[in-house]
Amino acid sequence: MAEKLREVIAPSVKTLVFVILCMGLATASTSTLAQVYPSRLIRIVVAFSPGGVPDILARVLAKEMQGSLGQSVVVDNRPGGGGVIGADAVAKAPTDGYTLLMGSTALAIAPALYSKFPYDPRKDLTPVSAVAKSGNVLLVHPGLPVKDVKDLIKLAKSRPGEMNFGSAGNGSSNHLSSAMLNQLAGIKVSHVPYKGDAPALTDVAAGQIEMMFASVPLAMAYAKSGKVKMLAVTTPQRLRLLPEVPTLAESDVPRYEFSTWYGLFATGGTDSAIVDLLARETKKAFDVAEARTQLTNLGVEAALSSPAEFRKLVNDDLERFARVVKSIGLSLD
């Protein structure tokens, strides 16, 4: 009986020992990778053309990281598909920390716009650190007979479906900003999509359409010349760059909040030690006075975070924008 018992147990013990050894080797291999990282060039993918906020943030980070880590760090612009093409390239890259993504709120909006999406935003990308935040500014033609948001809502309710707001295109952040205003303020302002912010702003300034939401730098430039009037910002608190402009939440739309964030991602499954190192390097890079000045010039504010904090922000926005997109029946399929 004892002999038979040994025959049954022995293979099981051997199998268990083998599994434990394999697990140990895998852990050792991963830890070793993290210890020698980085040992070669790091690539930061930007899913938009050069010159925009994500691109400039990536270049600031690349410059500072290169000096700190002693390895080359380059920016790789891969525009197209509203940011999906570049993000997908990082989602499908090796999980070694050498291919990163400087992403934005567009990453949380895009999955809700398509019935089939090339990657899983929760599993295939690892949030490393938020970098900066901003918001949109509600602009109206200066000839519109309103002095604040309360007046605008009153006017829109008296003319349901007759007024128009412009956007940079279907599914853009200013499109969703406007859709949220329609919902929360109980108004019906029609959407006119353009191919970019500039032509939409031109038509607001010319009085062809009544209003739109625009990024802070664009809003400031047009308002300074008197071409548009700024009524409110979409962020939960007033912006340091525009302290005199109230938030929508304090302007008769109490539940309104739409913040734009920018942040660094690694491929899903990247070792946590590498992710933590990258988060520390990101914080170090944007703690430099010169980098902070560049953020201000871009019309954004520093918003550095831990990987866990950034993951929560991204997941919350994935859920929120899915609800908004569903409520307005928007699809880009």
Where does each model-flagged region fall?
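N-terminal (or domain-start) structured segment
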Residues: L33-K123, E162-N164, N170, G186-F213, ...
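Beta->alpha turn/N-cap motifs
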Residues: M102-L107, S167, D197, A214-A219, ...
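N-terminal signal peptide c-region/cleavage motif recognized by signal peptidases
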Residues: S29-S31
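Hinge/capping helix and adjacent helix->loop/strand transition within the periplasmic-binding protein
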Residues: K92-G97, A112-P199, L248-E250, W261-Q294
